[in-house]
Amino acid sequence: MPSPPIDLTTLVAHGLDPALFCVDRLGFEPDPWQARLLRSKASQCILNCGRQVGKSTVVAALALHTCLYKPGALVIVIAPSQRQSRELFIKLIGFLQCLEPPEPREEETKLSLALSNGSRVVTLPGDNPRTVRGYSAPALIVEDEAAFVADETFDALIPMLAAAPDGRIVLMSTPHIAAGHFYQLWHGGGDWERYEHPTADCPRVSREWLDKRRRDDPLRFSREYECQFGNPEDSLFTVEMIDRRHNLVSVPLL
């Protein structure tokens, strides 16, 4: 039996409050910092977070809310590799499937989505700036694992927002080395709303689990779980190594 349509008052409330939308329609109860991000009006947000705090989950929800409540919106999701950008896209699709009544879709592929209201989601790899050219006036750009995306690619993203006065960009990552656009924007000035949340902030990750990771590799622990940037000479990571780490078993977020 089809679900009844959502009444206008509730629809307006969900449009105005993405955190309420997450609770009522996605079954996702945001942590306090996630609710703050969802309700933020800032056009530029940067998230320096430890692993498994829920940054991808909340940004996927924000991207879906943008698509639903801004008809004709273009959402661009970019990450160091195509597979990584698809991971956040999969989270968005998972949220989309939670909606009752269902949201009509015009087209869905492994790398993109088009809704009946004209909104689109496009996923792109961040290893080549040429792949991001050709898009304009996005409502939202999401750069996932931004510390590992090429600086030239980030430079190619920014001009897209010139024709989008209400466009937003969200950079999110675990830190890497003290270099590159993610590091510079995190520590620099500019009109960026900043969020820093080490993994210890997440109530779903146990202290015992974190203590074990710290004993295993203190240097990596400080970078991946405590939001600390490493020295450039300590860097041995490649995009392929970062891509492979996403295949590891993760602590459940929900």
Model segments located where?
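Phosphate/NTP-binding elements of NTP-utilizing enzymes
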Residues: P2-L254
